[in-house]
Amino acid sequence: MFKDIITYELDDDVDEAYLLEIAGEIIESWMSKQPGFIQWDIHKDSIGEGYTDIVYWETREAAQEAEQQMGNIPNAADWFSCYKEGSIGSQNLQQLGSFK
């Protein structure tokens, strides 16, 4: 499994309800149709200022292919307008093991 970890702050004019609404639209219209997509989790930090999304993919290649297709997202401008300019960071993780 491969994970994209995206950190960000919301733009000043965006609230969490709008973020979740737009995320739902992105899932329905685009992301769920991407080969290798598993799930997208949105988290808020304990002080409520920073957000972290974890997007799960079957493989690194599936994640990279989806990234190349991001220009085809029907309402990409609405999605990207949620993020405060300059606040986005990302990293990628390859899962080695999982224990319960």
Language-model regions, residue ranges each:
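A common structural junction motif
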Residues: 73-77
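Short S/T/G/P-rich N-terminal loop/turn motif that feeds into the first structured element of a domain
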Residues: 1-51, 58-71, 82-100
